[in-house]
């Protein structure tokens, strides 16, 4: 009788552990691999143009002048990272690194880029964090690796705009870095 009880208890514990592990894995994947609108570049541009109509003419003028540029870096773990950058209309040391939030991409921060670049006269750099936009990676991060990536992007901004930059770093949400 005692042997049957132990076997039954063991089976119940193994099943319970399997259920808990399965549920934990499901929740982890759900939170770290949500519907990633950050990969939909065309949809992101369309959303921005619909929401902020002035961005269309600004983007078109930047592209016609060759001022909206792309750059790529590699993170220490060999993930290829992307950013857009635009120099200010007049030479300046003022630079803004503008970082998007969870499941977004650099495109969805262009309204802030517009303000800093066109209205405040800053150089701007807008990175795509891991697994968003044109950046590599197999999962969106929640800040742990992003913090180092943002520092690397700030160093890249110094390389692009000069070592004497006066920099502001805008993080859209707390999980950005």
Predicted regions: what is each one?
Residues 140-161:
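Alpha/beta-hydrolase active-site loop
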Residues 117-134:
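Conserved alpha/beta-hydrolase
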